[in-house]
Design a protein with these regions (language model features):
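Domain-level signal for soluble alpha/beta catalytic cores
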Residues: 1-301
Length: 301
């Protein structure tokens, strides 16, 4: 199986990454207040029926979780030259997830999104583009650590790319610096409306593109008129911005729409975006219903 088709299941399900933070008490929480949140996130994803899970990304938002560990950054200020983290940032939680489930994705905040979430307070960097390239070099170390840990897929989150704010050519260089450093399949997640950037985005050398189609149904028409050239498509079909839980028939209809446009073999079924801001109950049932809807469509093929 090629890197693009790394999971041998039609309409396999996954997550974009983050899950609600559900803290637990007890002795363990004294040593690690978020250990229980990781356990809950992993258990809920498995219970919902997800095929490729994450560690839940419960230790911070997408900027703070990585920026807080990289030398050269204090808070949200870039104060010196960016260096790789002294130790792996997300590997411990990812390894825990792998003790519970065979297929786990590693997730890294993309260099451009990270750069635009930080303030430059040093003459070391003239602009966000220079910063993004040094962030990419530092994140290569994290990517390789996740690969060594045994993740099934490396996802790079670049929500900033749909906004028109980031330099897409530098973004490509930065993402590919990370993607080319590993041998495992790579995915890039970009949320929002991709109409103005899609032609540039599709030039990025990754194995999977992950977009939202529930909140941005126009993305379906945009993508249907373009050649994915053998890449897979993460098909966001659950709204991550509300606690209102879609029914199985509602989600099934969205997946069926995707299957009308694309070969089901290239689709990975997931929510539009992360679930961090949702209630635990809403997040769980959104994933549960999504998995059931994917199963129904799969059986009907």
């Amino acid at each position: 199986m090629s890197k693009a088709y790394f999971i041998n299941k039609v309409l396999a399900t996954t997550v974009v990454g983050s899950y609600p933070v559900v803290k637990a008490g007890g002795l363990k929480s004294l040593f690690d207040p978020l250990a229980g949140a990781v356990e809950t996130a992993v258990a809920d994803q498995i219970g919902a029926g997800i095929d490729i899970i994450s560690d839940g990304q419960v230790r911070g938002d997408m900027i703070g979780a990585f920026a807080g560990k990289l030398p050269g950054i204090k808070g949200q200020e870039v104060v010196g030259k960016i260096q790789p983290a002294a130790s792996a940032i997300s590997v411990a939680d990812t390894k825990y997830a792998m003790t519970k489930f065979p297929k786990v994705k590693g997730i890294i905040t993309g260099p451009s999104s990270l750069a635009h979430g930080l303030h430059i307070s040093t003459p070391m960097y003239r602009n966000k583009e220079e910063l993004a390239l040094d962030l990419a070099a530092a994140l290569v170390v994290e990517a390789r650590s996740l690969e060594a840990a045994g993740v099934a897929l490396l996802q790079i989150d670049e929500p900033i790319l749909s906004t028109g704010i980031a330099d897409l050519a530098i973004g490509k260089q930065a993402v590919e610096m990370i993607a080319s450093s590993v041998r495992i399949p790579t995915c890039m997640h970009v949320c929002g409306n991709i109409g103005n950037v899609i032609d540039e985005i599709l030039k990025y050398n990754v194995n999977v593109f992950d977009f939202e189609f529930s909140k941005n149904q126009a993305n379906l028409d945009i993508l249907s008129r373009r050649d994915l050239t053998g890449r897979m498509l993460g098909y966001g079909c659950v709204d991550s911005t509300t606690d209102e839980v879609e029914t199985v028939p509602e989600i099934r209809k969205r997946i069926e729409k995707g299957v009308e446009y694309f070969d089901p073999k290239i689709l990975l079924i997931d929510p539009d975006c992360g679930m961090r801001m949702r209630t635990r109950e809403a997040a769980y049932w959104k994933l549960k219903n999504m998995c059931e809807a994917a199963k129904e469509v799969r059986l009907a093929l």
